[in-house]
Design a protein with these regions (language model features):
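A short, N-terminal "cap"/entry segment at the start of jelly-roll beta-barrel domains
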Residues: 1-39, 54-55, 127-152
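Conserved hydrophobic/aromatic beta-strand scaffold that supports enzyme active sites
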Residues: 26, 42-46, 64, 83, ...
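Conserved short histidine dyad/triad with adjacent acidic residue
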Residues: 28, 43-59
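Residue-level recognition of conserved beta-strand positions in structured domain cores
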Residues: 44, 57, 76-78, 104, ...
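A short beta-strand-loop-beta hairpin characteristic of the jelly-roll/cupin
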Residues: 52, 61-88
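Ligand-binding loop in jelly-roll beta-barrel domains
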Residues: 87-88, 96-123
Length: 152
């Protein structure tokens, strides 16, 4: 019998870090493994200055993000041809199957609460190594544009 077989409210103190397939370090949260979740996971993420995830998608699961602090650019699309800027207080939605990656171009960390409809969190993560060269080009262009806007 599982330790989560009886329905109960559970409180989790997020203390344990783990490395996600995406190349970022997450703080463990609500998941099938920690509380017996059946249809959702929630964890904390901090992206350091200059950090970014690997290009990836979540095969069958949607993602909702609440940005606590800092600002991130999320590249997305089949060729990472689009991007959105999110700042503290913003909510971000990423549909299932959409290639994407967050990047921190600022000088301070980004903190966010990440929620997915994947109770095992990393289960449906699919890395997209074929997009990494494109990601590097896009990030370099964004850095250049940011430097240029600061100088003008």
């Amino acid at each position: 019998m599982s330790e989560f077989s009886e329905p109960a409210c559970r409180v989790l103190r997020p203390l344990t870090n783990y490395n996600g397939k995406q190349g970022l370090t997450y703080i463990e949260g609500i998941a099938a493994e920690t509380v017996g979740a059946k249809g959702i996971c929630m964890h904390l993420l901090t992206i350091p200055p200059g950090g970014r995830a690997k290009a990836h998608l979540h095969e069958r699961h949607e993602t909702a993000i609440y940005v606590l602090d800092g600002e991130a650019i999320t590249l997305y699309g089949d060729r990472l041809q689009h991007h959105v800027l999110s700042k503290a207080g913003d909510l971000v939605y990423i549909p299932a199957g959409l290639p994407h990656l967050p990047v921190n171009l600022s000088g301070k960390p980004i903190s966010a609460v990440i929620t997915r409809t994947d109770p095992s969190e990393q289960e449906s993560v699919v890395l997209l190594p074929e997009l990494e060269a494109i990601a590097e080009e896009k990030v370099a262009a964004l850095k250049s544009a940011k430097r240029h806007s600061v100088l003008t």
